[in-house]
Amino acid sequence: VLVVGGGMVGAETADFLAEQGHEVSVIEMRDAIGPDVIHEHRIFLMEAFEKYGIEQITSAAVSAIFSDGVSYKNAADKSDETIYEARGFDTVVLSMGFSSRYTHRDGQNVVYDFADELKDIVPEVHVVGDAVRARRALDATKEAYDVALKL
């Protein structure tokens, strides 16, 4: 499983999936996994990454998403135009802090449905949390849990 996004949600998702027996890799644009996680919790989370052998790819700006992985550039060195790939995964989980819909693109007010675009390249798309609609955290967490059990 490749988890795209190594913030709090992505890191915890990776931990959960690894705990369930999946081989997991996480790709993150920033230079560390879980920089937004509370320090004390991050210690335990990174111990879990070590325990389960979760691969960490950092400083990686994803440029394309495929059904089996992603291509990316070096986010730490803007002069490096090399395109790298992380491919061969059976599942790609997006946890990029990205709304599935937004209303501003290239200076224009538009409605863009990212989930619909993904349906052309992957067999399943599950939109969860506030990307569906704003609501109580408990409801969104339950919804994400139900989807994670299906993976």
Sequence positions of predicted segments:
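Hydrophobic Val/Ile/Leu positions in short beta-strands of Rossmann-like dinucleotide-binding domains
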Residues: 3-4, 26
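C-terminal non-catalytic scaffold/interaction domains in large multidomain proteins
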Residues: 1-3, 85-86
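A Rossmann-like FAD-binding core segment of flavoenzymes
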Residues: 11, 18-114
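A conserved FAD-binding loop/helix module that cradles the flavin
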Residues: 6-16, 32-41, 102-104, 110-113, ...
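A glycine-rich phosphate-binding loop feature that marks nucleotide/adenosyl-phosphate handling sites
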Residues: 1, 7, 63-65
